[in-house]
Design a protein with these regions (language model features):
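Alpha-helical positions within canonical tetratricopeptide repeat
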Residues: 109, 150, 183-186
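Acidic/histidine-rich alpha-helical segments that form the ligand environment
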Residues: 31-73
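"A position-specific structural signal for the A-helix of alpha-solenoid helical repeats
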Residues: 137, 171-174
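Start-of-helix signal in alpha-solenoid helical-repeat scaffolds, especially tetratricopeptide repeats
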Residues: 132, 167-168, 176
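Short, contiguous alpha-helical
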Residues: 1-32, 72-115
């Protein structure tokens, strides 16, 4: 939660700068190095405090987004405020929650999280950069469930929205059961 709160704060600050018509501070370039240093500073932060702070910041992000609306805004892969809000405050937390659930043996809840994310993002007609990512994640879930034809269909749907994920798909351990399938091989061909 500390990690999510820090990223929400950083993103909120940039969004506020946009709402005020000022140039915004871009996100850090080396994410892994930055996260490692920041997480070390968060050791000892009570989970309830970090969770409350993260939730509060999410509310503030939504308030500022309502002021700014859909506008050009570059934040990593995101090119608009809408894409950035969804990535920062929807898909990013779900990636961490999914990993946590798997690490703690709650495989069904982890699968359900990605199933619900795909359904929700389809329902709101999420931008391709976001929908493609959640469909890719659902493909990994279907692969883990042994539902390989569905996994391939989801990869086929997601990669046109997220061509940047094609290289990752080729080596993603979550898609390993698909590697020998000719249809999958065709999809990841570069």
């Amino acid at each position: 939660m500390f990690h999510l709160g820090m990223w929400r704060e950083r993103f909120l600050n940039a969004l506020v700068e946009v709402s005020e018509g000022r140039p915004y501070s871009p996100p850090p370039e080396d994410i892994d190095k930055f996260n490692e240093a920041e997480l070390a500073r968060g050791i000892g932060t009570p989970l309830t405090d970090a969770g409350s702070r993260s939730d509060h910041l999410f509310g503030e992000i939504l308030d500022v987004y309502q002021q700014v609306g859909h506008a050009p805004f570059q934040w990593y892969l995101a090119r608009t405020t809408t894409e950035a809000v969804l990535r920062n405050s929807y898909t990013h937390p779900r990636m961490h929650l999914h990993a946590y659930l798997l690490e703690n043996g709650d495989v069904e809840a982890a699968h359900r999280l990605f199933e619900e994310a795909a359904a929700e993002m389809r329902a709101v007609a999420a931008p391709p950069i976001v929908l493609g990512a959640v469909l890719y994640n659902l493909a990994c879930t279907r692969s883990a469930q042994g539902r390989l034809p569905e996994a391939i269909d989801l990869i086929a749907e997601s990669l046109p929205m997220r061509p940047d994920m094609k290289d990752a798909a080729a080596s993603d351990p979550g898609l390993a059961p698909l590697r020998d399938d000719p249809r999958f091989q065709e999809l990841i061909k570069t």
